[in-house]
Amino acid sequence: MAILQFNKQALGNLEYSLQREMLSTNRAGGYMNTTIVCCNTRKYHGLMVCPVETLGGEDFVLLSSLDETVIQHEQEFNLAIHRFPGIYEPRGHKYIVDFSYTPTPTIIYRVGGVLLKKEMLWVHTAEQLLIRYTLLEARSATRLRLRPFLAFRSRHGLSHENMEADGKSYPIPGGVKSRLYPRFPWLNMQVSKEAKFVTAPDWYHNFEYLEEERRGYPFREDLLTTGYFEMDIATGESVIFSGSTAEVQPDRLVSIFEEEIARRTVKTEFLPALYHSARQFLIIKENHTSLTAGYPWYNARSRETFIALAGITLTQPSLMVDQCVEILDYHVENRLHDGIFGTHFAADTQLWFFHALQQLESFIQGGKSEIWARYGTAMKEILYAYRDGVGNDRAENETDWYDDERERYIHMADNGLIWADMPGRPLTWMNTMNDGQPVTRRPGFAVEVNALWYNAVCYTLELAGVCGDDAFVKEWIEMPERIKDNFRATFWLEQNPQQPYLADYVYHDGEKNADIRPNMLIACSLPYSPLNEYEQQKIFTVTETYLLTPRGLRTLSPNSPQYQGICRGNEHCRNTARHQGTVFPWLLEHYVRTGFRLYGKGYLMQAKELLGGFEEDLLNYGIGSVPEAYDGDAPHEACGAISYAPSVAALLQIHRMIRDSERHS
């Protein structure tokens, strides 16, 4: 893979550099996210974005940017870049000669005879940003000015000039502290050497965020600066800026930075970059570990957690079994109520939990017995909830369920399959909505929900049998055959006998939806499949023909009249396209797993080609990571979250499949 590095020509081209974002995170939940030239293009961008427990634990942008100015002979050279209406000002990107992502995001500026290096990182376990400035070359006396711009607002919002903001700065050792509004933490801004802080509070107006404008959202913001630091800096000298929610000792900043840089791994190769990206999703907060679904706008979400967990934790060179178990334990102990995780209305989330357990089994000490001891009760609770039905007692209001014989919106029908339907609410992972209605409504029997249901029932019976739960086995032993028989009878389509496949969902009176979607492939890839080898081969072929791209699987065949090949524009446009052709990398795991299941070592070359195709893409969009989605049409440009846990997990799972296949060659 090309080293995660960019030269002056690339950095100076804003059409190129503003489309590439860097991300630095820590275990405490904080992160830094901006473009590789440090020009914010999203409301989610900022140097310090971190959870604020006094405001519900949501993420807030405290420090939006830090503008650097090099001063020589009373001439000022501003290294920052911002977009204002009709102009970029200042245009500090013209001074950038190099950007490197490893071991930590590093920018080198050339201003005449001055060569200045900037290294940025988040402290591993604290809400603390460190930026080290090193003057590599200078032909005359040099001063450095640092001006912080403060936001103190939700990452989902924008700030505007107001009378409530406290523009004062209060002295602390080595710097100042500011807090624009009550209930926020103090932002302690300190430097590692003696410096003057010049108090000069002022609002700067109409910062523009290009990506928000493209996405159809408000995109202008006002930011407050309380003043600036100014200090001399000598050739060969380093100065460290610290932004933190806790006051630190200035003389400790150098050692803290050195300790943090030493723990960074080199990320110049494809797999180390993926391993590093995977670890960025793990957050330790309130004494438990969670898995963030993606950056920069997602929090932890149960569906994404169960889909991605094994790939994030169990593919690392140093296995993270304890973290995997801790996350699963937390969900069972704190989020499972009456067989449903949290209050999320979803027919599939609980069933992905079983798949996560299946993948954990071979890594946890005690194997099947330990899985059953820890999770057997939860597994049975979920199955009983699905069998007996989840309905209006969990609805938010009386309109959230049918007032007829199907008032329980998720339940097992007489044929053993799971029926899921609620007016005005999507219940599967294809869950976007426009104008209060699902875009991709899939009511009734959804194919992947029932494949997951079959897998969950079979796996629970397997463990119950091994561990001696005879009563459960006796009660459920006939279910797998019943589900399997009716699964094929319900979903199998032979409109074209030469190319049969599965209906995406089946509604009233057996009406089969014939859209070619990737959900049917999940029925082939799970450890327990309700399909035989012939059926799996047919589905694999249809998937390869209509849905496979170099970046994942399309959510709908291009031959469909509803197909949308570009996922761009305002929220309505993006929601319309999201599951109508947009490509998702996480689905590739199921495609490759099915390929190995059907063709064994004969599939190795194609699997390698698919995985290798992502190497160069780590230089795009969210550098060093894998995005949430891509356009369905070539050239398959990235869209959605810049770094998405299920996407990264899928590629790491594919790498493990390839490695296992090679070991058995």
Describe each model-derived feature in a short phrase.
Residues M1-V266, R303, S318-M320, D329-E333, ...:
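Terminal accessory carbohydrate-recognition/targeting modules of carbohydrate-active enzymes
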Residues A2-T54, G342-G366, P500-T543, I566, ...:
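C-terminal capping/lid segments that line or modulate ligand- or cofactor-binding pockets
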Residues A195-M231, W429-A446, P558-T576:
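Glycine-rich phosphate/pyrophosphate-binding loop
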Residues E137-A138, S159-N162, P171, M231-T235, ...:
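Aromatic-rich carbohydrate-recognition surfaces in CAZymes
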Residues D251, L360-R374, Y459-I477, Y534, ...:
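Inter-helical turn/loop segments and adjacent helix faces that build the functional surface
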Residues T268, P272, R387, G391-E407, ...:
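Catalytic cores of carbohydrate-active enzymes
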Residues I283-T305:
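Internal amphipathic alpha-helical repeat/solenoid segments
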Residues I283-L291, E333-H344, W419-F445, D509, ...:
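Acidic/His metal-coordination segments adjacent to aromatic residues that form catalytic metal sites
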